[in-house]
Amino acid sequence: MKCGTRSLAVLGALALSAMGLVPAAWAADMSQSGEASPGLVDTPISDIQAVGEGDDSAMVGATVTTVGVVTAAYPAAESGLGATLDGYTIQSPGSGGTWEPGRTRSDGLFVYADKKGEIPAPGTCVRVTGTVGEFPATSAKGNPQSLTQLAATSVSVVEGCQAPMPIPATRVPTPDEAEALESMLLAPQGTWTITDNYQTNQYGTLTLTPGESPLRSATDVVAPGQAARDYEAANAARAIALDDGTNTNLQKGTATEAAYAYLANGSPARVGYHVAFTKPVVLEPRHGSFVFQPTAMVAGHPDRSPVTITGQRPGAPTVGGDTRVATFNVLNYFSDLGVDEAGCTGYPDRTGAFVTAKKCKVRGAFSREAFANQEAKIVSAINALGADVVALEEIENPVAVGVGTDRDASLARLVEALNKDAGAGTWAYVP
């Protein structure tokens, strides 16, 4: 592959800088040269991405040299996090920019640098030599999607490469389209909506769907059975996760100190809130499915977020009746505690004190202090609902758990605590 002039290298970096991919200070730092060695033949990224068995590269195991512009960078152990991506993404110079129906090969490639490898700055054009592989390896993976990557053994800077451009995307790519766009820059267009935030505080992901409404559970709309299965399949085709640029579990170790990617006080990411993309993302498979990956790690660096989130919590609807019914998830309110169960351990807080029972018969608070804290918050919240009837979820049934004989023991205790706060006789429970 022959790149152009040095002036084009600077132009390419400036283009990436304008897209928000490259800090302005990097845009002019493109003067190093990495000339190809005599006899060296560069393999186009699209050839490396040619599909062989399954969705794996046909060149798995081969040692190749290729040229590409760095579009995303994920240094090892950034911000002290352990499970970082440890590499960078490159894309064929001058590629992208338009959606091409019928595309069969990607022009993007993930370069694995390991924990101590060099991570070039985004916007840099590089010549990389390494071994082609899949992550996870075909023999080890238990999922249908893997990431084609190049395990780098040498890297040099090339001058004169035209910057790649993000491809506009108004919907979630189909599986075949995603394979042909793997590791390439996309620029999602229009409004997207948060349809799931269950793993946001653990793995930093938000599940999005194009349009202005979240996806609904199948049996909210259709009858159980084949119709529901078909509906869920259609939902799956319209959903994609926005990742945070790391594989770190944010609920463990020092990662608990890292700022969340898409959550902040006063700026929630509720289901139904709208998302607009302000920066390109990389489309890549992680943990068995394709995701939108930011071009830099957002965990610990929320200012790098590629999206803005807007929304307003809907108010209570106006109805004709005067009886107010509410539902409340008490999140494993167990009056039987982990500390009282032989052999039970717990999940620790930042001080190391066990807060929640871990893999025990009981599933709630571990200590009396933790239970008192949980109970106080539940009591305050329920009494503030102004409800006449409250249906509870995740409250202990000691008989089912195998630690007691009174099915309603925890329910009775909670009602007692509610009445102590609201006044005797305010609440009663249905046995």
Predicted regions, residues:
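Intrinsically disordered, low-complexity serine/threonine-rich segments
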Residues: 10, 34-36, 403
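Short, structurally constrained coil/turn elements
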Residues: 21, 319, 422-423
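Extended non-catalytic accessory segments flanking core domains
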Residues: 28-30, 34-356, 374-380, 418
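Conserved SGNH/GDSL esterase-like catalytic core that processes O-acyl groups on lipids
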Residues: 354-372
